[in-house]
Amino acid sequence: MNTHPLTLEYLKKVAMRPGMFMRDFDLRALELQLYGFEAGLSAAGVMGDFENFNRSFSDFLLSTTELSCSQGWATAILSKHGQSEHSFGVFLSLLERTTFQGGNS
């Protein structure tokens, strides 16, 4: 079940053209964009009951990698992989593994 349909559609666009959405593959900027995106969905009255992607992804990341997400999922990934295109690839790889994306966690 895809519990984050609108957010995942947004992330598909980011994955196809990351330079249009963030500078230098900045995961922190992406995480903040997602907070804003979901605030917009909520204000428009179109956010689903389970649309809180950042919280769900942080929970997934903690359970599968044991990385602390106390400062957000982006900081957790960056603490292990550094700020680079590689860390963006790690994020996309983890995203593919999530149950709300349809993967096997």
Give a label for each model feature.
Residues M1-E38:
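Short terminal alpha-helical segments
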Residues N2, P18-F25, G45, D49, ...:
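Conserved aromatic-histidine-acidic binding/catalytic patches
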Residues N2-P5, R28, G48, N52, ...:
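Alpha-helix boundary/N-cap detector
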Residues A15-P18, S58, L62, T75-L78:
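Amphipathic alpha-helical segments within well-ordered protein domains
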Residues R23-E66:
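Amphipathic alpha-helical interaction modules
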